[in-house]
Amino acid sequence: MKINTPKFGLNRHDTSSVKGYAADVARAESLGWDAAFLPDSQLRRRDTYVLLYAAAIATQQIVIGPLLTNPVTRHPSVTASSISTVAEHAQARTILACGVGDTAVRLSGLKPAKINELRDSTILLKSLLTGDPVEIGSGRPSVLPFRQDVPVWLAAGGPRTLEMAGGCADGVFIRVGTNIENIRIAALNINRGAQKSGRDPAFVKLGAVFHTVFVEEEDKAITMGKSMAAGYYEYSPMLLKNLNMHWTGPHPDLLKESEGIWPDFHHHANLEESGRVVDFLAPEHARSFALIGNAKSISIQLVEIISEASVLGIEFEYIVLQPIPNPPTPDPGPDSYLERVPKEIISGVKESLKSTHLGI
């Protein structure tokens, strides 16, 4: 059986300085990471495109880009200009991933983009990045004179957003956890959106963001995984319903208020603490929404997910292994997540997939 080997990306690097970020992405490239993604969150990190430009200059092969930006805090024309400038120094290895807005929006007191707004901004971005004249109310058509060919991806989890993304994006990053049933449903929604728009679903690439609790102590890892499951329920409760899993505790908003969880169950400063708040969830909840455990355990989970998806005709272009909890900044040395994961997990996963392809 032929199984596509995905590119593995990391979305947490040293953002304590521009120089530090460039060096950290170069370090990731040298250690075998295929992609380096950067959340666009202006109250948490330095300017996204300044950091990406520095990384572009410092590297040669690694794929770079924001994951994710949004049409609320930046107008699409500003984003198109910025990502094209980055791509001048990272041609054929820059991508742009957008979403409704996460911490960038919520921590600024703004509202996430609506689905129609995200769709319209995606169409505008694609037009600007392909050099097409666009009407944006300036009196005459606008053109980006230094545009670069940068693919526009969307990040999504809900069925309506996934369907919309399949109809207009070059690729879709799904954030639906690690259970193959939710992955199957997400791919189905993307394909449906592509078909409704007259597109061939095969041309819409797929990526996945997996929260990765790379923690040796199983009980501790499960507790953090429960916080991840709660975070998914907080924003996309249908993901539990799809798996016939139940939420037996108070509403997440009530728990956040009473227990001081901020800003949500995915981003709380102490994920063991937030995980204990939802201890009514079962270990299976945690395992359905995060990769959990030591290197061997996570490697097995990844190979199973990729193989099961391939049987269903689902191939991943990218898999982003988002570290849980966030690593320290900076995170130097051989014990760091950035150095351990390629050596202890990614290399073995790629070898296993290669062996499967060769029938070994």
Predicted regions and their residues:
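N-terminal beta1-alpha1-beta2 module of alpha/beta enzyme domains
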Residues: 1-68, 150, 358-360
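An alpha-helical appendage that flanks or caps ligand/catalytic pockets
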Residues: 2, 111-143, 183, 188, ...
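Active-site mouth loops of central-metabolism enzymes
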Residues: 6-19, 69-76, 146-157, 212-215, ...
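Hydrophobic faces of well-ordered beta-strands that scaffold small-molecule active sites
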Residues: 6-12, 36-38, 63-67, 94-98, ...
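Short, acidic/polar
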Residues: 16-28, 82, 156-164, 297-308
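Acidic (Asp/Glu)-rich catalytic clusters
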Residues: 26-30, 52-61, 83-94, 166-167, ...
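Glycine-rich, proline-tolerant flexible connector loops at the mouths of alpha/beta enzymes
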Residues: 35-58, 70, 102-105, 177-180, ...
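Alpha-helix-loop-beta-strand connector modules within alpha/beta enzyme cores
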Residues: 49-69, 73, 128, 339-355
